[in-house]
Regions:
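Bacterial N-terminal signal peptides that target proteins for export
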Residues: 1-9
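Cleavable N-terminal signal peptides
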Residues: 10-11, 21
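Short boundary/loop segments of OB/S1/cold-shock single-stranded nucleic-acid-binding domains
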Residues: 22-37
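Short aromatic-glycine-enriched beta-strand elements
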Residues: 49-60
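Short nucleic-acid-contacting surface segments enriched for D/E, G, S/T with interspersed K/R
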Residues: 81-99
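OB-fold/S1-family single-stranded nucleic acid-binding modules
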Residues: 102-128
């Protein structure tokens, strides 16, 4: 009986520990996955950091004003596995890229990167594209 209780207790503890980890790794916790959009602009910066790279771009609005967008993405290790490195992004800084993404639930100029098309026409679509 004692071993059975210990096993149940361990299972309950693991469930409580795993839930926040799963939520952290789910873009749908922060981003509205049902609201995809496409945006073109100048790639200004890429933070090649763990746990997720962050892509910054300036996009001109119809009135000529510039919006400074920030897109979160997969970790650097994911990009290396698909043969795309920091240098590939560095070459595109200052050039026009097209991003397909979803907006943050909190609003603002913040999104999750689903696809990026580089100036040479090559594009990369993230494999992990959850549904709402």
């Amino acid at each position: 009986m004692r071993h059975k209780f210990s096993g149940i207790l361990i299972a309950i503890v693991l469930l409580f520990v795993a839930a926040p980890v799963w939520a952290h790794h789910s873009p749908s916790a922060v981003f509205d996955m049902s609201k995809e959009f496409t945006l073109s602009g100048t790639l200004t910066k890429v933070d090649w950091i763990n746990p997720h790279i962050v892509v910054f771009m300036d996009a001109k609005k119809d009135d000529g004003s510039v919006e400074n967008w920030k897109f979160e993405s997969n970790p650097p290790s994911w990009f290396r596995r698909v043969s795309l490195g920091r240098d590939d992004f560095a070459k595109a800084i200052g050039q026009t890229v097209t991003v397909q993404g979803v907006r943050a639930k909190a609003g603002g100029l913040y999104g999750y990167l689903l696809k990026i098309t580089f100036p040479d026409g090559n594009s990369l679509e993230l494999v992990f594209k959850p549904t709402p």
